[in-house]
């Protein structure tokens, strides 16, 4: 449900999911919850009306957070479970990517760029396989967005990815390489292993 409008079908799926979470919170006697909406809702013209529907249907008040807040939450979720002190952290979502530069386990810089897995798919729609020229065009587009970030390191440092897209890529890599476990947390792939 990306683009100018958060589509009704996508809204309904999200509301159904949130109803399940609301039920689980009630069953487990959770007294305080925090539900946030990220880039897909943030950029949709009907994002605030969707939040009203969520509140009405699932009795969950939601807040739209900024890209900086989204990056900060991702950092908070990672920093205490990763044994690396300097790295780039990225969260590739459906509508955006959040990138943070971490040094000495501190988030020095962060940015949210409106390029996500779903938004890129919609922007560069193709029927069937992508041609080499189209792939080159997509890479050029992404590279231009990344080059606008002045604090990105010029020399290689570890990159840590979080979110659904990264989980799926890790699962594909595990299957492809014959990895014997299904554990994803702290799963490592070399840059050569990606290609």
Where are these regions (language model features)?
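Early-domain small/polar-rich strand-loop-helix modules and first-structured segments
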Residues: 1
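Helical "lid/coupling" subdomains associated with nucleotide-phosphate turnover
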Residues: 4-30, 35-86, 101-195
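Conserved catalytic-loop position in the HRD/HxD motif
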Residues: 91
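Active-site-adjacent helix-turn-beta-strand microarchitecture at beta-sheet edges
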Residues: 95-97
């Amino acid at each position: 449900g990306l683009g100018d409008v958060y589509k009704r079908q996508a809204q309904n799926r999200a509301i159904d999911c949130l109803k399940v979470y609301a039920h689980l919170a009630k069953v487990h006697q959770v007294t305080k919850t925090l539900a946030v909406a990220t880039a897909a809702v943030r950029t949709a013209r009907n994002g605030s009306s969707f939040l009203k529907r969520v509140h009405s249907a699932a009795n969950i008040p939601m807040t739209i957070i900024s890209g900086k807040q989204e990056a900060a939450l991702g950092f908070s979720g990672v920093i205490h479970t990763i044994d690396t002190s300097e790295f780039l952290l990225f969260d590739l979502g459906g509508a955006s990517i959040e990138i943070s530069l971490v040094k000495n386990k501190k988030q020095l810089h962060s940015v949210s760029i409106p390029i996500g897995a779903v938004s890129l798919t919609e922007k560069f729609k193709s029927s069937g396989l992508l041609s080499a020229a189209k792939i080159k065009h997509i890479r050029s587009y992404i590279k231009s967005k990344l080059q606008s970030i002045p604090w990105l390191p010029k020399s290689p440092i570890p990159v840590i990815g979080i979110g659904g897209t990264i989980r799926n890529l890790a699962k594909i890599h595990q299957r492809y390489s014959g990895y014997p476990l299904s554990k994803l947390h702290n799963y490592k792939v070399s840059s050569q292993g990606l290609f």
